Amino acid sequence: MRYDIAIVGSGPAGLSAAINAKIRNKNIIVFGTENLSNKLEKAPEINNYLGFYEISGEDLKNKFKDHIDSMGIEVNNNRITNIYAMGDYFALISGQNMFEATTVILATGVQYGKPIKGEEEYLGRGVGYCATCDAPLYKEKTVAIIGYNKEAEEEANFLNEIA
């Protein structure tokens, strides 16, 4: 079967794309994980998502799940490892399985390098990746930023105004 759209990623961007495609009566397949988004699930409080404030990541994730369930959108747990342009369609590979789609949307989120010891364990409990999202949690506290690029410097300057 060839899908109109294959969406790789089940976080906020991927699910938003899926909802919009479904509304437009596109034949879609969404690849992701059963829990939708590990990073979202671990967020202690979200205040920068329009329409939702002072909501935990887990509660927001549950709202996402309710929304896609109400529209009949399912998340396929196959992990896509390769995508090939085949002319007028794309072949998406997962193990021995191949899926075809006319359009592919990559919504895999931000990928981080090798984790620092304790990083995964404390994600959402002191460790964060988004100054805009997490800065209010660190108001008037001492924070440390680990980063190796211009973006990390900008995040540090932003946090300096709040923490």
What residues fall within each predicted segment?
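Rossmann-like dinucleotide/flavin-binding elements
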Residues: 2-3, 7-30, 112, 123, ...
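FAD-binding core/adjacent interface of flavoenzyme oxidoreductases
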Residues: 1-6, 75-141
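N-terminal Rossmann-like dinucleotide/flavin-binding domain of flavoprotein oxidoreductases
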Residues: 41-98
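Short N-terminal binding/cap micro-motifs at the start of the first secondary-structure element
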Residues: 14-16, 37-40
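Residues in the short beta-alpha loop(s) of Rossmann-like NAD(P)-binding domains
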Residues: 34, 43, 149
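Short, acidic/turn-prone active-site loops that include or flank metal/cofactor-
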Residues: 34-36, 54, 111, 132-133
